[in-house]
């Protein structure tokens, strides 16, 4: 049985995440995160191309992800392009270090559980990609971001992907339903490129038969 992190108040939740960051957790589910390279739909953007080549977050990419002028889908594409590694990565830590330098107030607000939707989204998705074997902490941050900014499809879809990643073995139907249900909740248009959404659905739809 999975313990829902939604029962924690926002401030307490983020504090808990900082405390348990180094605690090992069991690996779960399939690999929706490392099987959906939707950044391919954004390779016209120089930041995405740079991320795909470097695979490591630098200050310029961190600033781009955190900038209010960067749309959520483009920030997500950069994070997706940075990729994953079976040995783990530390890009979410790099982003927080950069945030601490460039906007100490935003960093402190995040640390005390009052982070903006952009910071929550960026740290959450980076953390999920950095440690895709254990995504519950990242899932909690993305849920907070989604609650703060429910109008953005990109946040909702990434959250659904991370939830799918952390589903218990045997709940494959939920891997299919999560992204599809998310898509259905945004009938009036998506701010994410359709070709990027297709990459995600092409993977998660392979589990459709598990819902029969």
Per-segment meaning from a language model:
Residues 1-8:
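N-terminal secretory signal peptides that target proteins for export/translocation
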Residues 9-23:
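Bacterial N-terminal signal peptides
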Residues 23-29:
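Sec/Tat signal peptide C-region and signal peptidase I cleavage site
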Residues 29-61:
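N-terminal alpha-helical scaffold/docking segments in eukaryotic complex subunits
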Residues 31-44, 67-90, 114-130, 153-167, ...:
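Amphipathic alpha-helical repeat scaffolds of TPR domains
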Residues 55-64, 91-111, 135-147, 170-187:
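Alpha-helical repeat scaffolds
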Residues 118-122, 136-140, 150:
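Short, well-structured alpha-helical interface segments that form or flank functional binding sites
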Residues 147-153:
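Structural alpha-beta junctions
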